[in-house]
Structure formats: structure tokens, C-alpha cells
Amino acid sequence: MVIDEYTDRKTNLNLDVQAVYNANRYAKLVKKKERLQNWLDYYQLKFERHPGKRPIGRTGCLGFCGREVDQIDYYRARISELDKKLASERQRVLNDPKAVMPVAFVTFDSRWGAAVCAQTQQSKNPTQWLTDWAPEPRDVYWQNLAIPFFSLSIRKFLISIAVFALVFFYMIPIAFVQSLANLEGIEKVAPFLRPVIDVPVVKSFLQGFLPGLALKIFLYILPTVLMIMSKVEGYVSLSSLERRAASKYYYFMLVNVFLGSIIAGTAFEQLNAFFHQPPSQIPRTIGVAIPMKATFFMTYIMVDGWAGIANEILRVKPLVIYHLKNMFIVKTERDRERAMDPGSIGLAENLPSLQLYFLLGLVYAVVTPILLPFIIIFFAFAFLVYRHQIINVYNQEYESAAAFWPQVHSRIIASLLISHVTLFGLMSTMKAAYSTPLLIFLPLLTIWFHKYCKSRFEPAFRKYPLEEAMEKDNLERTSEPNLNLKSYLQNAYLHPIFHMFEQQQQEQQREEKVEVRIDKAQQHHHRQVEKEEEEEEESKSSQATTHYYHHHHEQTTTTTHHHYHQHEHMSHSHMGPSDTADSPSPPHFVYHYGVDP
């Protein structure tokens, strides 16, 4: 009813309105069927290659317990049962009014109409008819469209608390790792480790590479956790999920990697003095601590930055994961294609890392300039490597129209402010009392510039100009007067429930064709075995010699093989090229005449 009311209001502008269904349960059933179908394909191919032995297995945990069953019959029965549930669930989604969510995708016959609708208030009641730009079809995260609107604020509040706790939970192991740089403190706490620490190789390893390596291990699983948190918040597009996850990851790295490394290095030496000093002395303390951590950040750039770029171009991690999947998970060609999928570039993880290196470059440009060559080398190789990977390796999941740039601009401004505070603290340690107050103008000018850019240029990333929309509409009408937009856009935002149903029908037809091919081959195999047995009995009943009997049997076998291959060729030609393409290899079971399947 809500969608009909909206359609009545916008009849002169919109082309189509596509409702959003709460089909999350249906999608889970489809994924479950895909897993079962994959196992069925695996056992059918296995039996196709060795028809003399039916695949037998147990139904319990990982096939180690439970009753023994025929795997092909077992998975066919489970898929048949699941098909009934899918049909019932699909009918429920299409017929139940509660399954229709108060969300819809509206397509317009012009860019101007879409811009007016998306960027204006539709109702005098501010809580009704909320409109916004829809993400492109590839960018839609359909699962979160079913989340009620009133629960989004609660979810975001709870996730904010969880992120805050996560940041300070990770502070504990990172602080311990950074304290390893102070070997004298470790020797005081654990005197029995002194003989090991005094070894030159161990000492250089602990002071040089271990802190950076341990920090990288701690940060390895973090992007996945932050992406899950962003999904719980309820964002409805993949680009929004990656932007939120990238924002969380940047705050985490700023607090733990940058500030945490600096504070931990000094807090273990002067913990009480640091926390009991007045706030005016904190910039001075940080200004003293940051130059002392330059060596650590040099090793961190080499371990994480340089080695990370080399690992990116070599793709060692995806290569290892692919071979592990190929050994333990891959069963069919479909599994192999999924294992070989390179995925996307992962902006939620890579973008905050680049912003952290940019922060280090700005902070240490004045404090410790010797760190700048490490940063410059990293960005030079990163530009070449990531450019190559984006063009030739990774898949593009969506197009967000530079939606990430406002966040990147804000991070650059924040890095400038941190560098100003650091320089202010460093100058105060050098007793430059007359020149230090002049540095106050630097953060003020930076904040003014940020506000100016935000008010002037940010709307270009958030809104679509009506002038440009009108120009493109007129150009399109002139260059393509016969363009049928409705037929072009009618399935653009079609709910996945319909695509899944079509794929389900296609897979069912393919499964039936595979079963028919296997059954026909099995029937022909039985006929060939029976024919050989009859000919053998006739030969034994005759009065021929033994030598003649063997010669006659060889001729009969050769003729039988030739006849079977002719029949096989005719059968595949009749099924067409699509049927032969589904089979990864010819049916080798025709040569196993000894045992009945």
C-alpha cells in the first residue's frame, strides 16, 4: 500500500518501483542447497569415473560417525526435501504482506527527476518518505535492508561502545610488545632470561624486528572483526560497509599503533610522572617521546610497508590459501573457481594503512627527517604495485563515485593537526619560549581550511548537480532518441530472490541431464556385460577348439568396444554442446566390465 501511494504521487517522473522483500531465510536455504548440490556433484563425478563402486559414507560429524548411506541417494533426498522448503518459503515471501519491507528502489526516466527526488524532502512529516541515492545494483547489501529503521540507532550505539572497548583491549598486548624495546626492564622483571637476552643475535632481534612483527600479527585478524561490526550496524551498501570499517580501523591504528607505541615506550619508564602531570605538559611529553620512537617506526615501515608491498605483488597469502583449499576443500570445478577468485582490493584494510604511513611522514618530517626516505620509498612502490593490482588482478565489486575521498581528506587534516601538536611539544623542550606561541596559528589555519573545503567541495561528493543532470538528459535524448529506459532498467534492482529461483531451475535442469547421462551409460554398460556373458556361453557350448574360442572372444570384445564408442558419440551429439561441457572428463566407467555397480 505504501509503494502504491508513492507510485501515485510520482507517476509523471518514475518508471518503475521495485519492492524489497525480507528474503534472508530464503537466501540461507539457497546457500544450504548450493553446498548440498556441490557434494552431490562431487559424488556423481566420483561414481562416473568408477562405476563399479558406489560412494558410501557416514552421516555423522565429518563422516566419522552415524549410519552408512549411499552418498548419491542421500544428497538427492536432502536436496529434494530442501526444494520443498524453498518452494514453500518462496510462496510465503511473495504472498505474505509482512514480508514486504517499507523500502523500495524507484527508477526514473531522467537524471533530473532522480536528483530532485533523492535530494529533497518528500513529506511535511520528517519521519516519512525518507529518500536517498540508491547504491548501484552490485553495491547493495540486501541482508541489511530487512533491519527495522528504529533499531539502526541502537545498533550503532552498541557497536560504538564495542569498538571503544576493542581499541583499549588491544592496547594491553601492544603495550607489552613495545616494552620489549627496554631490555633492561625485562632483565629486572625476569633475571633468569638475562643469559638469553645477552646473546647478540637474540638482543638485536628483540630490539629490531620482534616488536614490528608482533604488532603485525595482532593487526592481522582485526579488519575481519571490524567488518562484521559494520554489518551489524546496518549499512545497506558494500561501499558504506567498507567506509565504516576503514574508519574504525584508522582510529584503531591511530590509538594503538601510533599513540600506543609512543606512550608505551615512555610509560614503562615514567608511568606515574606521565599520568600525574598537568594537561599543559602532555604535548611536551609527546614531543619528547616521538623522536625516541623513530627507530621503531623505521623497522615497522620495513616489516609492514616494504614487506607488505612485496607480499602484495607476489600474492603469497592468496597462493597459500588457494593450495590449502585445493587440498582440503575443493571437490568440484565450482569449488576451484571460487578458490581462484582474487576478490577485491580490500579498501577497509589497505586505505587506513596508507593513511597511517602518511601520518608518520607528516609527523616525522620536522622531528626526525631521516624517516622520510623510508616513507618515500614505500609510497613510490605502493603506487606502482597497487596500480598494477587494481588494473590486472582484483575484481571491481562496485563503483561508489569517489565516496571515500571526504574521509581521506579528514584523515589528512587530522594528520596535520597531530604534526602541529608534536612540533609544538618539541619546540617547548628546546626552551624556545618566544617562538613556540607562534605555532598556535598553524592548527587554527588548518581547521579553517578544513571547514572551508568541507562547506565548498563536500556537497559535490554528496549531491548531484541539477544543471549537470539536465545537460546529460538532453544529450541522451538527442543522441539516442529511441532508447527504451524501462526495458533497460526494469531488472536492475530485481531482488535476489528471483535471480536465485532462476538459478535454481537452471541447476535442476542441469542435474537432471547429468543423471540421465549417467543412467543411460549404466544401462548400456549392463547390456554390454549381459551380451558378453551370452556370447561366452555360446562359445563354450560349441565344439570349437580352445585356440579358435580365444580368437573368437577377442574379435567379439573388439567389436563390442567399437559399437559402444559409436553409441557414446551419438548420445553426446544428441544432448548438445551444453551437456558435454558440463562433464569435466569423458565417462571412463565403460571399461570396468568386471563388477556390477
Task: Give the predicted meaning of each segment.
Residues M1-E532, E538-S542, Y548-Y549, H553, ...:
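Transmembrane transport/permeation module of multi-pass membrane proteins
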Residues T557-T558:
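Intrinsic disorder/low-complexity segments
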